[in-house]
Amino acid sequence: MQVFAHRGASGDNPENTLIAIERAIQFDADGIEIDVQLADDQVMVFHDRWLHRTTNGIGRLRDASFEQLRQLKTHGDQQIPTLLEVLDCIRGRCQLNVELKHKEVAGPTLNALDFAVEQLGFAPEQLIVSSFHHRLLSELRYNWPQYNYAGLTASVPLDLAEFAQRIGCSAVHMDVANLDDDLIKDAHRRGLQVRVYTVDEVDDVIALQAQGVDGIFSNYPSRAIAALKPKEPSGEKATHGSGVST
């Protein structure tokens, strides 16, 4: 089961920042998940519509100029990065899942991914584009078929994983709170992977692996990776009642 660092290693670092991304790579995460939005014609790596939760700014991200955004600091004294800065930081060292927060950011994002493949050492199969906007994913796959697409859902759809297959996705990304065995089985029957968000508890990590989930998104990737490592056999030899070691 693969481990994706959710917004980078965001449990111990400011989310969606270069330091969180670099830390996730140091932890040997299989991939990193980030969120992108458009502001002042720049693809910014940021989750919320509003600035105040994670930065010292106020107002909406989309209303700020690029210069204003550059002056802001996150709670960990980091800048809000652009997508190109994130791609340049990773340079193909792991997979990257880019979640599109709205339709307008899609074209500039895919153009940036093209640049990453041409100039920054990524292979197309390392790049995943995900969104709750399923029609948008279908349109993007028509124009950029070389990338992987994943349909996000917070509930169990009536048609289970059929929606993802219908729009040409290679995976379903599902909320851990509503994960369903029938959805996992249906997705696998259709040749789709199932990745689950957001998984921070060790017990959940182990249980999801047993359920056959293909990947998880975690704010604490090092914790999840450690939980998935095979337990090393004890170096002590077994001792029988006779006192003879075998």
Question: PLM ranges: what are they?
Answer:
Residues 1-246:
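Phosphate-group recognition and catalysis centered on beta-loop-alpha active-site segments
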